[in-house]
Structures are given as C-alpha cells and as structure tokens.
C-alpha cells in the first residue's frame, strides 16, 4: 500500500498527496500548518513524518472537516475551526509568528463536499442550493441569488467563472426569482433547478463541459470569498514562516493559480530598481522574500486516471529567504 492509498479515504482521494508534502521539505521537529484540513490526507501524512516534538496545526472552516479532525488523537496535532486567512492571528495567539517551517494549502472544494448533495456544490446531484464552506455563517447561494442584481450577478459569473454567457445566465436567474416573488412561488432553491435554468440560457453547449460548470464555480467562489481569503493569506504567509520555511499551494482553477504564481514570482524578484540610479550593488536594499522551488507540478497521468478531479490541480512551492 502506498502513501496515497493509506492517507486517503474512499470518499476523498487527496490530490498530489506525496508531492505536496515533499514540497514542504519536512523537518522531523518542525512546526507546520495545514490550512485546509479537508478529510485529513495531507495532515495524516505530515504527522507520520514528524518526531515526537514536531507540531501540526490544522485549519478548516467546514464543520464536517472539524469533526473528522477531532478523530485524530495526537498530542502533536491541533485543529482550528477557522478560515486559513486567520493563519496570522492563530500564529500570534500561539506565539508562532516567524517560527512556522511550512504552510500547506489545498484550495477548492473537497470530494466529500461535492459528493454530499445536501451541501449544494454539485450541479450533478439534487440538493439545497447552499454552497457555503462554513454552513454556520453567511448567506447560502439561494439566499444571495434572491437579492443580487442582474448586473452584479453577471459581473460575478464573468469575473469568477470566466463565463462567456454571463449576461444571459444572470438575466435568466434574476427573472426566475422575480417571477417567483410576483406569483408567490418558491425561488431558486435546488442545485438541479439552477443547473437546468443555466443550461437553457446558454445558446451553445461545450461537449466536454456541463454548461453550469463555470457558473457554479463563480457563485461558490463569491459566496465563500475564496479569492479574498487567498489574497489575505498570501500577504501574511511570509511573515509567519521561519527562514527556509516552505509555502506549498495546490490550486484548481486558473484564477487561483494566476494569483499564486504572480505572488511567488513577485516575492522572488523583489521590487524593480529603476535603471540608471547612481547606486552600487551593495547600496540597493533587496526586497526578495521568497525563492521559487522548482517548476509547477501537475498530477501524473496515473493519478488523473485514478482521480479525474485532480486533472486541473497545480502545485507551486516557494521558500522564505
């Protein structure tokens, strides 16, 4: 049995399991943060490689992930029901700022979240139109769609889903909910109901992709403020890490990956110094904070066959200077 089999469950195959943990360059006595515990695949593998005085802090905003984490009885392990954007505050409380040897983030929706119809993430299964990572906070997708304007919805679909038919889809959704309000009928409240409405609004179908794919992604990203969360943690990660500490991030769509790639490149190059200034090299204050480690890593063909949901995954790793 390999690590991927041992540290994944039938309900959730951890994507890029060995590659992500290898990217952290684990020290046996190190302090690590798994910012997206999920169902614990990465955390369990990290724990298996730490010495008795190693330490792992895991974070997740999904109550079901927290319940899963609480089954781990290990004095080296600590779970926080928070968002990963809270990493700096957690580290301040635990006196770990500048002491963390590695941070791992596995972005996106986990397989159990997609597979559990009642979570409302899937356009393939009928369930309540929820889409919240943390079901204890904020508006559900259904509630938000009942109050959003057509213009704002089109912007969300275009910006976060890169949906070419954003205006058509937004118009169809807002009109449906307006008519429901006028006639006293139920507004959009089920996943398959929304998926069908989107499919009917789209004039051209992609043979290889469900017409609701981009819209569901966009609504989910907006509802959960996913890109804001990512931007926030990127800004604070360098401060939290110890020198030579690693940042390993797995992203699943181009918006996330562009943000991660741009951040790591910018931090590894530092601020541009205008040419022609009368400064010696030793007078220039270097602003590089990270070193990019290797190239982006994608799942192997074998992993993609075993877990089709891994196809779009990209792992990027950087090290604090």
Swiss-Prot record:
Main location group: cytoplasm
HAMAP family in alphabetical order: 16SrRNA_methyltr_H
Location within or outside the cell: Cytoplasm
Organism: Pasteurella multocida (strain Pm70)
One GO location term (cellular component): cytoplasm
Catalytic activity from the UniProt record: cytidine(1402) in 16S rRNA + S-adenosyl-L-methionine = N(4)-methylcytidine(1402) in 16S rRNA + S-adenosyl-L-homocysteine + H(+)
Keyword tRNA-binding: no
Role description: Specifically methylates the N4 position of cytidine in position 1402 (C1402) of 16S rRNA.
Name of the protein this chain belongs to: Ribosomal RNA small subunit methyltransferase H
E.C. code: 2.1.1.199
InterPro entries from the UniProt entry: RsmH, SAM-dep_MeTrfase_MraW_recog, SAM-dependent_MTases_sf
Binding site for S-adenosyl-L-methionine: 40-42, 60, 84, 106, 113
Family: Belongs to the methyltransferase superfamily. RsmH family.
Keyword Transferase attributed: yes
Name of the gene this protein is made from: rsmH
Pfam families assigned to the protein according to its UniProt record, in alphabetical order: Methyltransf_5 (PF01795)
Enzyme type, top EC level: transferase
